[in-house]
Curated annotation (Swiss-Prot):
One of its GO terms (molecular function) is RNA binding. InterPro entries: NusB-like_sf, NusB_fam, NusB_RsmB_TIM44. This is Transcription antitermination protein NusB. One of its GO terms (biological process) is DNA-templated transcription termination. Belongs to the NusB family. One of its GO terms (cellular component) is cytosol. NCBIfam families: nusB.
Length: 211
């Protein structure tokens, strides 16, 4: 059984995983049921898992081909090992995504479904309505990066955190910590460190602007 989590933490995960699939008007957003959010989230997780497994299979195939050539090209051995290592990481990532998909409905059952739904929809609505403004804020603090070049999951984690700080009156520290936790769960080591740095710069810029 998954551990009981606070409703808002589950809401953030639901919003993160549903953003790409729910683009409703504010009126239609209010009509979305919790089951629709769960379905959208599970679809996102399973799609990501399939993509990861396909990439892993490709890495294994290429690694095997390089091993077959290793008798004449010793450098191929190291390259093949790197490919197999990457394939293992991708496979583990896919397994983790599928585990989250299995856990999600039960996590919501253990929490207050009303609270989970309400805050998830509030987050989705805020991000969708104010996306241009949110993205401008993020572009201003990205160093040597463009927002549209980031992995989608990282972009949406950043958008949710900025929406919470700017429009939902969530304290900076809480929004950043929750974003880092989501990144640890759905991104990678580089991803969560990068997200932490971007949000720290964003809140510092906000502090200077407001003073």
């Amino acid at each position: 059984m998954p551990p009981r989590q606070q409703p808002r933490r589950i809401s953030r995960e639901l919003a993160l995983l549903s953003l790409s699939q729910i683009n409703a008007t504010p009126e239609k957003l209010e009509q979305i049921e919790i089951n629709n959010l769960i379905l959208a989230a599970i679809r996102t997780l399973t799609t990501e898992s399939q993509d990861m497994l396909e990439t892993a299979a490709s890495e294994v195939t290429q690694g095997n081909e390089r091993l077959l050539k290793s008798e004449t090209q010793s450098a191929n051995v190291q390259s093949a090992r790197a490919m197999v290592s990457e394939a293992l990481k991708l496979t583990q990532g896919a397994i983790n995504r599928l585990a989250h998909a299995i856990e999600l409905p039960e996590m919501i059952q253990l929490a207050s479904q009303y609270e989970v739904r309400e805050y998830a929809l509030e987050l989705i609505g805020a991000v969708n309505r104010r996306r241009t403004e949110i993205d401008q804020q993020l572009e201003a603090v990205l160093v040597d990066w463009q927002l549209n070049r980031l992995p989608k999951i990282d972009r949406d984690i950043l958008r949710i955190a900025v929406a919470e700080i700017l429009f939902l009156e969530i304290p900076n520290k809480v929004a950043i910590n929750e974003a880092i936790e989501m990144a640890k769960r759905y991104s990678d080591d580089e991803g969560y460190r990068f997200i932490n740095g971007v949000l720290r710069r964003f809140t510092e810029r906000l502090r200077i602007t407001n003073n």
